[in-house]
Amino acid sequence: MSIVINWKPDLIAIEDIQLQEFREGKKVDSDNIKGILIFKTLARLQGVIIECCIEQGIDYTVCSTNTWRAHCKVKGSTRSDKKRSMQLLVKEWHDVTVTEDEADAIGIGYYASEIYGKQNTIVNWEE
């Protein structure tokens, strides 16, 4: 919360959560239960973040993973391919090497700033 108060962002972008579906023919096991518990924890965290945004008067958006990845032109068919693609895009854009999570955060921010960010115009007062 202190980072929000100190930085006073115009917008906070949150990646949407998704419940991994059970595979057909697979019985419910500890992996499925773990996935459900993770989903519930992320849903609660998302709610807390949204409530903080509302309390502080900060705009927020919840971004679908597929939507921000498509906007950033992420390539790949598997999860790991898409993660690596986003890392390479960040390297291309900013010439920095980042982790998968950092690359995803940059991609979400890139998407949100272009789609929802305030459009600032420069006024030439000398004219």
List each model region and its residues:
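Phosphate- and other anionic-substrate recognition elements at nucleic-acid/protein interfaces
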Residues: 1-127
